[in-house]
Amino acid sequence: LWSAPGSVTANWSKSQTERYALFAMGQMQVKPKTVAGRERAPHDLQAGFFYEQQISRAYGLGANGLWILMGQLMNKHISELDRENPILSYDGNGVFTDTVRYNRLINWSEQSHFDRAFRNKLINEGRTDVYGKLIDERSFVDINSFKPEDFGVKLFNADELLNNGNGYVSYYGYDHLGRVVRGKPSIEDFLNNPDERKIGAFQPVYIAAWLQDQFQFKDLVFRLGLRMERYDANQVVMADPYSLYPIKTAGEVKTMNGLDINHPSNIGNDFKVYVNDLKSPTKVLGYRNGDKWYNADGSEQRNPEFIANNTTNGRIAPFLVDPNQDEITRDGLKDFTPAINLLPRIWFSFPLEPGKKTFYVSYDVLAQRPNSGASFLTIDELFYLKNRQGATISNGELQSRIKTDYEVGYKQIFGRTRNRGLEISASYSEIRKDFGLYQISQGYPVTYTTYRNIDFATITGFRAGMFMENIGRNDRGPLTLQLNYMLQFADGTGSNISSQAALIASNQPNLRNVIPLGELDIRHNIKGTATWAWRGGKDPVTKKNLYTGPIIGGKEVFKFASFSFIGNTYSGGPYTPTTQPVQIGAVQRAQIKGVPFGARLPWQYTLDMNITKGFSLRREGKQNPLLINVFVWVTNILNTKNVNSVYPYTGQPMDDGFLTSPAGQLVIQSQIDAQSYTDLYRVLLNSQTGMFGAPRQIRAGVRFNFN
């Protein structure tokens, strides 16, 4: 449950991000020529350009594991005896004593970089072993007999620290020792240099340019725009996500074992070919085009299991260009193809009643770049992928996700002084090419999981709002009221980028169902604001006093003062209930009860208050006064305990149900002190953050305005 006192924290990391950007924007108004004496409406043009390059570096080291690694690397080249050169023992009379000794056999090809570097260091320093003998090339070196300061990361090479994919170090933009790597190392710098294995920084380039025109045609107001976005991940990616090594295509496979091969008519020349044996193929079992699989007859199949089950060893067998290849080369990679998106924006409105009633429509397309965690594919992830069956890796080919917004609305201004308003709108948003987990089943040499632009979502909303200003005597009062309501439904195939993890773990890797989208599926949201605000000073034209509040003892007590109350309530978001509890900290998945996101959190309620009071002080020698604004801001005045999250088995924020479950009772009975374990477990439950909303908070401050 808890880390023991004195636990060693041995992980160390650092990171660095550089961002270089260029932004330019210009505006101009174009007045068309007068036609037949009629002046045509002007065009307000806006154009812009944006360039950005990020350079991200990171380095992490698991120092504790280095002690284990040193023990594995030291002395392994002298682990055998030199039996071809025995040393016979004789007594003083030259009689053989029946004792044969051997020196250690030095196998130089097995000597690790660490052993060579550390041994040379000890030899140069004249150090001795545990028996007091000077250390030489045949000495057994006990690393535990030396002090920590005798060692250093620089004694290892990159291959040893990366440890065939189970690394003690991770890095990009730095070398294996944590030194900054400038520029962009080539793939060959990693593949062909095991001592350094250089990995470049993540250096994506983003370019955008846009043009917008706003003009009026009769009583219609238009705002038309077009934005071009170019995203270049600036990295190498897998040439074929289903194989680290090049696969022959149907167009390349004409014969096999001296016999002609006739491919089905629906099989294209660029389809990948799969056979019955990796090393000695005798027949074609199927084909693949992208993610679509076909059997030998050309019939489309749902998955590639049928091919793997019919091979000689039960594993997928692509018809490799080089059947003996077991390490990735440049042929298995390609450069990222920059993605260009054209994003139109259309907005127009027309008055149903000039100055009072307006109808508007908008259409907008937006793009969002993938985050670096899902899209930055380091070369070491691919190089060691063959050793990591079922691993999750980044996808260097991720594209931007696209969101398309549609909105139609109606606005009306009314009241004697036009200080009342109403707005109603309906919206629909569609998210395409969203990011989600995807399993590459029967990839070669391993099945693995990555990210794809595969998820889809829709958000449907209705909004209504009204406001009333200057409520009071002659529509010049201090009170302003605002009320807004939103109804929103959000459904999609993934609530977040990792929402498919449970299905992948349950052997349903690429099943997509439409479910509510977590925080976006708000359903109901009501927000109201009431503000009392009094002005001060005199009207610069009429010279009348602008203060309309109460006067007490001849003082304008509420001059430059305001009181605001903001109330907000919304229905709780969805969560997924489960059929059994899971112990805190346990890596275990519980069975879903009902359907995903089939239950909802309670409603949320908050009431905030903001009080401000302004003062104006004259300053000697200054024309403008010193303005002082004092404020008190109180959030969640009623200290409402809003539930933000619950445990999926109980639906409660303070009890996960484990202690009272049969499994929990067994765990309690196995403890040395059952009561102590129970108490500590409850303390841990009560220590979880994020289960409740923020309590009442009071902030006070002063702002000074020096004009």
Model-found features: residue ranges?
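Short loop/turn motifs that connect adjacent beta-strands in outer-membrane beta-barrel proteins
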Residues: 29-44, 60, 82-85, 352-356, ...
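Signature of Gram-negative outer-membrane beta-barrel scaffolds
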Residues: 9, 47-353
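Transmembrane beta-strands of outer-membrane beta-barrel pores
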Residues: 51-55, 217-219, 228-232, 354, ...
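Transmembrane beta-strands of outer-membrane beta-barrel proteins
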Residues: 41-49, 220-226, 357-361, 420-426, ...
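C-terminal beta-signal and adjacent terminal beta-strands/loops
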Residues: 367, 537-588, 602-606, 612-707
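Outer-membrane beta-barrel transmembrane strands
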Residues: 2-58, 96-141, 191-219, 331-352, ...
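Gram-negative outer-membrane beta-barrel transporters
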Residues: 419-577
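Membrane-embedded beta-barrel scaffold of Gram-negative outer-membrane proteins
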Residues: 351, 358-370, 374, 383-449
